Amino acid sequence: MEYVYLILFSIVSLILGSFSNVVIYRLPRKILLKNHFFYDIDSNRSMCPKCGNKISWYDNVPLLSYLLLHGKCRHCDEKISLSYFIVELSFFIIAFPIYWLSTDWVDSFVLLGLYFILFNLFVIDFKSMLLPNLLTYPIFMLAFIYVQQNPALTVESSIIGGFAAFIISYVSNFIVRLFKRIDVMGGGDIKLYTAIGTLIGVEFVPYLFLLSSIIAFIHWFFARVSCRYCLYIPLGPSIIISFVIVFFSIRLM
């Protein structure tokens, strides 16, 4: 029976990895163009940017289609960006530690859903400096399910953890803005901190902020070295990396 779950998990991982390409490409553009909360990010089928032909379902099979088509459009031989293949492959590979660290099939799919959200938030924020509400808000729902599945994290600790993360991030930004007249984090960062706080509990929120601050500083330092005019960096990736370290440290304890 375990092999059935593993096969199902692999198939879902491949599908989510492929769908991540849609989310990463379309969602930031929809936000910038429409500035609206709810929208259908997959309202139109994918098409070749050169010849305009719709991409058929059999040319959208994760990983396999790219290899069989040699990274080209079936109709006009236009090169397909390697980034699509890399996103699918990296998502698929990184998904497997989640399966092996999960306690049962419900836990594995909850963690896979969380991974899908954080993976997309990481890439979108890194590329576009955006943390869409459409991806951040579902983390709260997953946190609720996760609490029911994991007795080590109580409902009280989850709620207080989210509240504490919100207060710390909001007050920190308010103080810096008061004296420096700049925002060190955006509203999306505060929401992400809050959502993640509900997943780790109040006891581990300080570690989240400590780690994310260190990682963000390292990121900022190298960004400044490579580009002296780069004043801002996306904070989301630092928050997500810190969460992964804290979260799986808790699970391995």
Swiss-Prot record:
Pfam families: A24_N_bact, Peptidase_A24
Residues passing through the membrane, by range: 4-24, 80-100, 106-126, 129-149, 159-179, 198-218, 230-250
Disulfide linkage: none
Chemical reaction(s) catalysed: Typically cleaves a -Gly-|-Phe- bond to release an N-terminal, basic peptide of 5-8 residues from type IV prepilin, and then N-methylates the new N-terminal amino group, the methyl donor being S-adenosyl-L-methionine
Membrane topology reported for the UniProt record: Multi-pass membrane protein
Function: Plays an essential role in type IV pili and type II pseudopili formation by proteolytically removing the leader sequence from substrate proteins and subsequently monomethylating the alpha-amino group of the newly exposed N-terminal phenylalanine.
Keywords of the record: Cell inner membrane, Cell membrane, Hydrolase, Membrane, Metal-binding, Methyltransferase, Multifunctional enzyme, Protease, S-adenosyl-L-methionine, Transferase, Transmembrane, Transmembrane helix, Zinc
Recorded GO MF terms: aspartic-type endopeptidase activity; metal ion binding; methyltransferase activity
GO biological process: methylation; signal peptide processing
Protein family according to the UniProt entry: Belongs to the peptidase A24 family.
Binding site for Zn(2+): C48, C51, C73, C76
InterPro entries registered for this protein in UniProt: Peptidase_A24A_bac (IPR014032), Prepilin_IV_endopep_pep (IPR000045), Prepilin_pept_A24_N (IPR010627), Prepilin_peptidase/N-MTase (IPR050882)
EC number: 3.4.23.43, 2.1.1.-
GO cellular component, as recorded: plasma membrane
Record-given protein name: Prepilin leader peptidase/N-methyltransferase
Major localization listed first in the record, in broad terms: membrane
Subcellular location(s) of the protein: Cell inner membrane
Free-text cofactor note: Zinc is required for the N-terminal methylation of the mature pilin, but not for signal peptide cleavage.
CC cofactor: Zn(2+)
Phylogenetic lineage: Bacteria, Pseudomonadati, Pseudomonadota, Gammaproteobacteria, Vibrionales
